Amino acid sequence: MSGQETPREFTAQMSVRAGCWRLYVVLLNTTERWPEHCFGRPLPVPTFTERADALKALGFEPAPGAEWAWTEDTEKPDDPASAVVLIAATRVRSWTGAGQ
């Protein structure tokens, strides 16, 4: 064994809230504030490079082989006329010890 710790993996999610795309890393079992980045705009959707740069600024990087998955939700549950909300998620790993 090399003595190096394996980086912990987390889920990063991205959605539009309060008029801007926000990327955040979900830290479970902690009272710490989740690391978050606001892109400052509702459109266009942040590019892959912008998302990777935001993760890096938060101390994370995409996990090897991870891909972004997009899910559709609604603002008002059980209301078919409600506006659509897009949520993206991917696996990330900490390279700064965040969430430890």
Residue locations for each model-derived region?
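Short N-terminal "domain-start" leader segments
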Residues: M1-W21, S94-G99
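Short aromatic-glycine-(Arg/Gly/Cys) micro-motifs in beta-strand/loop hairpins
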Residues: R17-R33
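Short, mixed-charge low-complexity intrinsically disordered segments
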Residues: E61-Q100
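A short, exposed loop/beta-hairpin motif centered on an aromatic-Gly-Thr core
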Residues: T31-P46
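Short, intrinsically disordered, low-complexity terminal segments
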Residues: E9, R51, V85-L86
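A short, charged, amphipathic alpha-helix used as a generic interaction element across diverse proteins
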Residues: P46-A63
